[in-house]
């Protein structure tokens, strides 16, 4: 028996891929005096601060001892750092602030069952921000002015109908956004605090996910839009506020304009990006163009500008070399120096990381499906993108579904490829970034044409000799979890096994239990998924719900769920597990009492991945690192089916 190259490649420890990064999320303060990043303190991600002249002098300024801090930002005056945090994954985020000079930390939105959101920041009013709070009515966010020095909250606009507001640099509300009955949006001007009775702009369903205002210039004279009206892909539009005239700033015929760099002082767009298979930047400003070209000459792989000082002299650059761990640099534009601050996961230096291929696949009805493929190490000796012989494959399906997969370092691709699997991610119809027609092609197609796209990708891979018909697993989170359940119920012979993470099993109950602050979007959900208030819509939702076809499942299934998930309630997993048990169908069910829509705590994520790779090893025959105490070190509850995963019963009996 010969040993293949991917079997001989070193096994990358799960901890190295899914444990805490050494550092991540680097930023520079607007005044350029401070560097900040996320790093572990006592095993939990916290915000760290260092003088920009001495990164080695960093110290933790937050003290979260339970859930990792994953989002933070600088106050415009550089005097405080702000972050949001929820409890147990319930997504009721509160806003916290740390005074840089004193180190004092306080809760800025101290309300129960409230989801705080930042509505606006300013270059001219640097000690205040606009925040939205839904503590009065969980469906709608009232707008408040928050004084970052005193902590005082002042009501700016009570909200009884709107999905959101847009503010200018004076922190004045200038536009209100309200869903309409067609599933689109109406945009209402606000003048001196009064919301207009009739909208100045509107979208229908087809433009609802690809058209939105994108902010004002600092002087308030220009408003930017990302806009797909009258076109397919979304363009960047500049609107003269005084005259209403709109001018196209940027467009691309294959992908939506997805990102922009704006002058920190004027707010004028200086560069823009679109992402088809890879992200491409185009500079409008000649000095920005020169800087981006200078960086491109010196950095391998992909890079992005993560943070800029107010005077624009220093940038924080994130660099993804693709087959080595990501790095973060400080770029001094005046001195033309590029200095590494940190490598996020230095333990991956020298690991057998694999390149990702960007592919264009074709669906059975002629749509182009931008996709990504990663092969096991050593499996493709001639480098033609096809393994020398067929290998097992994991179809890794993204969530949303109104989201997308992208190019670059992906810990799941690297992990699964290292275990001996080809890994394919498909931007099926409904994925965002590729124009409104591609999104609309998915309307009312959950479990139908959206699923057909995934099956077409699998058949392509089989036809190319990448994998074999009996060695394909399906795995994903949220919508990807639904796709897994759909795969095992609607096409029960296609996949060898499936891994469902926080996936809905019943579309009717999913729509009935959405978070209250999503209720303004319910008309769009009904138009795109199915309307439970009509007999036809309800029948379709039931037909597309894997729960009602649970008896079709004949292949192994692993389910992971967070008990506090506000989007896909625990009942979505409980229901299908109960239905399978009633029919005597085996299933393994892992529940986390302190998690929500996904697993934020590294020890919980690592534990589930330990179970997953040992589950896949039995199903597909790949390699696996033993479970080795990871489940015991997590909060995982094995509700059902420990006996179906290699080593799991032993772990529980220790």
Can you say where each PLM-predicted feature lies in the sequence?
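Cap/lid segment of the alpha/beta-hydrolase catalytic domain
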Residues: 347-473, 477-478, 483, 505, ...
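Short, Lys/Arg-rich amphipathic segments at extreme N-termini
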Residues: 8-28
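Basic/polar N-terminal segments that are highly enriched at the extreme N-terminus
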Residues: 1-15, 650-654
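Peripheral, non-catalytic segments that deliver or gate enzyme domains
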Residues: 2-4, 18-24, 34, 42-50, ...
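Active-site-proximal cap/loop segments of hydrolase catalytic domains
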Residues: 428-654
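Conserved hydrophobic/aromatic "anchor" residues
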Residues: 28, 37, 74, 216, ...
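Generic beta-strand/beta-sheet core signal
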Residues: 50, 226, 239, 272, ...
């Amino acid at each position: 028996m010969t040993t293949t190259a991917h079997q001989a490649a070193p096994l990358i420890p799960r901890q190295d891929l899914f444990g805490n990064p050494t550092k991540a999320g680097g930023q520079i303060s607007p005044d350029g005096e401070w560097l900040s990043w996320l790093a572990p303190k006592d095993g939990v991600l916290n915000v760290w601060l260092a003088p920009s002249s001495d990164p080695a002098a960093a110290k933790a300024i937050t003290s979260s001892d339970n859930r990792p801090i994953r989002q933070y930002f600088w106050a415009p005056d550089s005097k405080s750092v702000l972050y949001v945090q929820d409890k147990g994954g319930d997504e009721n985020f509160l806003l916290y602030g740390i005074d840089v000079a004193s180190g004092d930390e306080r809760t800025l939105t101290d309300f129960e069952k409230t989801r705080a959101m930042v509505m606006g920041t300013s270059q001219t009013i640097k000690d205040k921000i606009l925040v939205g709070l839904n503590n009065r009515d969980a469906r709608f966010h009232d707008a408040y002015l928050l004084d970052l020095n005193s902590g005082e909250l002042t009501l700016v606009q009570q909200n009884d109908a709107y999905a959101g507001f847009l503010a200018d640099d004076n922190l004045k509300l200038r536009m209100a956004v309200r869903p309409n009955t067609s599933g689109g949006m109406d945009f209402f001007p606000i003048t001196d605090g009064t919301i207009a009775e009739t909208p100045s702009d509107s979208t229908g369903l087809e433009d609802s996910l690809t058209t939105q205002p994108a902010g004002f210039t600092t002087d308030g004279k220009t408003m930017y839009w990302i806009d797909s009206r009258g076109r397919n892909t979304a363009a960047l539009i500049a609107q003269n506020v005084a005259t209403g005239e709109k001018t196209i700033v940027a467009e691309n015929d294959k992908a939506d304009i997805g990102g922009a760099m704006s002058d920190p002082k004027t707010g004028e767009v200086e560069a823009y990006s679109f992402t088809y298979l890879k992200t491409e930047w185009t500079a409008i400003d000649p000095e920005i163009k020169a800087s981006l070209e200078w960086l491109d000459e010196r950095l391998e792989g992909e890079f992005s500008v993560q943070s800029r000082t107010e005077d624009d002299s220093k940038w924080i650059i994130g660099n993804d070399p693709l087959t080595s761990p990501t790095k973060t640099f400080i770029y001094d534009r005046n001195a033309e120096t590029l200095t590494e601050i940190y490598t996020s996961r230095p333990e991956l230096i020298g690991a057998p990381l694999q390149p990702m291929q960007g592919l264009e696949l074709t669906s059975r009805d002629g749509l182009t499906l931008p996709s990504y493929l990663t092969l096991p190490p050593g499996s493709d000796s001639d480098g033609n993108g096809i393994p020398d012989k067929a290998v097992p494959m994991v179809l890794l399906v993204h969530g949303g579904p109104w989201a997308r997969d992208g190019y670059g370092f992906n810990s799941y691709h690297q992990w699964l490829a290292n275990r001996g699997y080809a890994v394919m991610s498909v931007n099926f119809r409904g994925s965002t970034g590729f124009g409104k027609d591609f999104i609309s092609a998915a309307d009312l197609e959950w479990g139908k044409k959206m699923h057909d796209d995934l099956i077409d990708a699998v058949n392509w891979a089989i036809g190319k000799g990448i994998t074999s018909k009996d060695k394909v697993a399906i795995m994903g989170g949220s919508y990807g979890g639904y796709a897994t359940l759909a795969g095992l119920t609607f096409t029960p012979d296609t996949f060898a096994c499936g891994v469902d993470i926080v996936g809905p099993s019943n579309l009717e109950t999913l729509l009935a239990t959405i978070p209250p602050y999503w209720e303004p979007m319910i008309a769009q959900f009904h138009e795109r998924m199915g309307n439970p208030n009509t007999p036809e819509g309800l029948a379709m939702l039931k037909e597309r719900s894997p729960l009602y076809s649970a008896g079709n499942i004949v292949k192994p299934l692993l389910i992971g769920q967070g008990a506090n998930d506000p989007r896909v309630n625990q009942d979505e997993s409980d229901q299908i597990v109960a239905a399978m048990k009633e029919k005597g169908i085996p299933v393994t069910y892992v529940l986390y009492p302190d998690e929500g829509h996904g697993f934020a705590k590294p020890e919980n994520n690592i534990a589930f991945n330990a179970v997953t790779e040992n589950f896949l090893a039995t199903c597909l025959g790949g390699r696996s690192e033993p479970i080795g105490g990871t489940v015991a070190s997590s909060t995982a509850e094995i509700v059902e089916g420990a006996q179906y995963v290699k080593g799991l019963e032993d772990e529980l009996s220790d």
